[in-house]
Structures are given as structure tokens and as C-alpha cells.
């Protein structure tokens, strides 16, 4: 969440940030609640001062032996104190209501985020590798996989519903190899510590990273009371590991990684990417999370981008990097780099990783701090896909397809697959 002090002292900045984001969030209710809170706060402070003055007088009378006057003031203060207690309770409720409204507000944006309505305003900053030129008709990943008998969408839909898939044989082995390859690279070369986190988490955990309360419709949840939520990304449990803790400065920065299945309802994407594995309700992802001191997050953001890029470079998959525009960036992000991999069947780059600096937005929600120079201060949090496994699977099939329908396995991946080619079954 953004700093309530910013809202109280410079709400015009918050309004401008909403305008830049093309956000439909209204500040009207928040302004009304804050106005009511301030009026009541003045009353409460005046009443507290009066109560303190009366308590002082009672003490003076008692000290002077004038018990009668002291008891008289005590009697007069009974109703007054009861009224003050009710006002303080109301003030507490208003403060909670203000904080609940603030939870719906998006993060403030970095000054260098491109201003624009949507993805068309994203700014390309890196392009790596040359898309392969094919001398045969290019197939998409679905046709390739079905021809190789490594994917069964029909049976997956029958046991679940649309946007689910069933990999098998060397298709399943390729998925597993990608997970192991990514984790090994991030842990052995980039300094991340691997975790195996819960994939069902509570509402407070989802609120900490910003999925709740605003994006509940995008989540799958249990019918328990209180409900548990299936994670949409391992960012959620990894970032929450140190929630409500003061992290020793000498432990920072913390580098965390995990492979998990991820679950999203895709409520807002009806009709988009219905064919194949691009947009699934369940998908595999290796996630990267960093927790660092506030003055290090910009530097760590650039390093995390390179960590994610290294996967595609090792697999020799062409990609580009864009800075997301103000109208396309996620709610919790201060600045985001998207890595987009080349898909020959679509003749375009498609997102395969988002790498975001969330500044102190998540840390404030979680009350996650460090102590520096004798003072506690909020840490900064960063997250990035390191990378989306299913979309990497797609990219390998499409970029390494052969004229006979087979798929060559990238050299870097062969120690993890145990085979160098996927061929049509006899």
C-alpha cells in the first residue's frame, strides 16, 4: 500500500498517479472518510486534553485534602469519559476504513515509466538473438505437440475444463527438465536460495502482496471459513516469508526462488489465447523474489532482469525486453520489465517473464522492515518470473521444430532431459 502520509499531505500526487495509470479507482470515498476522521480526531484530542486537565485537578484536590471537590469532578467526568470512549472507538473504525480504502490504490510509479494507455506504449530497450528463418511451413506448438504425441488437451478438458492440459512422455520430461534447469541456474550461478512453499495460503498473505482485496475474482479459493487461496504465483508465499519481521541489515539482500504450479481464473481474459498453452488456469513457473534495502532496489531490479534473460540466452531463444507503460503495468509495481520470447507461429514476441520492482508497496502491507543506523525502515521487494515454464516449453517446440515434425532439444537442456530430440512415435 502507498504511504498514508502521502495521501494526507499530497493527495494531488496520488490523483496524478491514478490518471497516469488510466485507473478507474475513485478517491471520493477515501477523501470523505479522511475528512470525517480529521474532524473526529480534533474532537478526541480536545476531549483528551480536557480529561487530562480534570485528572490533574482531581490530583491537586486530593493532595490538598479537598476530597469533596475531587469526588465532584470525578462524578462530572463519568459521562464525559463514556462519550470519549465512544468517540475513540469510532475514530479507530474510521482509521481502519481509511486503511481498507488505501489497500485498493495502486503503487506509485517510477518517473521513467513510459506514459501510455496500454501495451502499445511499452518501450523496447533490448533485443537479443535473430528469429530463425524456416524453409518449410511453420506449425504452432499445439500441432507440433499433437504430432509428437506429447500433449493431450482433449482428455485434460474432459477431466477438468478448458484452459487445462495434459503433457506426457517426452513432453512431460521436457517440462520437468526446464524446471530443474532454471532452478539450478538461479541457485548455482545467481545466488538464490531455493524454497518449496505452500501453494494454499490465507487471505492475509494474499493481501500482503496485493492480490487482495482488489483482485479476488482472479483467484481460486477453498470453501473453508476462512478461505485458503491457490497461489497465482510463488511471489506470494516467497515475499511473505519475512512478513511482520525486522530483518537484520547484514542478511540483506535476500534472494529467494521456487518452482510451483500456479493457478489463475483468467476472469478478465475470456476469448483470449484459447488455443494451446499460452493462457492456462494451471501452469508451472519458476519465480524469483528479492528483499533488499531501499537504496538498492533499482540496482537489484536490473540484476534480476539479467538473471531471467540468462535462461533464454542459454536456450538460444530470441527475445526482447520492454519497459511497461503506465497503462499496462501491474497494480503493485513501481516499474516493470517484460521479457517477450519470439513465437514463429504468431510471428511476434509474447510475454514470458515480468520483472517488477514493487518499491515499499508490499513491505508496508506486510510491515516487513530492517534496522539501519538505529532506526527501523521498510525494505523494498522485487519479483520476476525466472521464467514461465510452459511458455518456454512452447517456445522450444516452435523455435526448434524440424521439417519432419521432430523437435531438437537445446544443447544447454540436454543434461536435464537425457535426450537430444523428440521424434514422432512409430
From Swiss-Prot:
EC number: 6.1.1.11
Disulfide bonds: none
Any GO molecular function: ATP binding
UniProt keyword annotation of Lyase present: no
Subcellular location: Cytoplasm
Pathway assigned to this chain's UniProt record: Aminoacyl-tRNA biosynthesis; selenocysteinyl-tRNA(Sec) biosynthesis; L-seryl-tRNA(Sec) from L-serine and tRNA(Sec): step 1/1
GO BP field: selenocysteine biosynthetic process; seryl-tRNA aminoacylation
Catalysis performed (reactions): tRNA(Ser) + L-serine + ATP = L-seryl-tRNA(Ser) + AMP + diphosphate + H(+); tRNA(Sec) + L-serine + ATP = L-seryl-tRNA(Sec) + AMP + diphosphate + H(+)
InterPro entries recorded: aa-tRNA-synt_IIb (IPR002314), aa-tRNA-synth_II (IPR006195), aa-tRNA-synth_II/BPL/LPL (IPR045864), Ser-tRNA-ligase_type_1 (IPR002317), Ser-tRNA-synth_1_N (IPR015866), SerRS_1_N_sf (IPR042103), SerRS_core (IPR033729), tRNA-bd_arm (IPR010978)
Positions contributing to L-serine binding: 233-235, 287, 385
One GO cellular component, as annotated: cytoplasm
Binding site for ATP: 264-266, 351-354
Keyword Calcium: no
SUBUNIT field: Homodimer. The tRNA molecule binds across the dimer.
Record note on domains: Consists of two distinct domains, a catalytic core and a N-terminal extension that is involved in tRNA binding.
PANTHER family linked: SERINE--TRNA LIGASE (PTHR43697:SF1), SERYL-TRNA SYNTHETASE (PTHR43697)
Name of the protein described by the UniProt record: Serine--tRNA ligase
Annotated organism of origin: Brachyspira hyodysenteriae (strain ATCC 49526 / WA1)
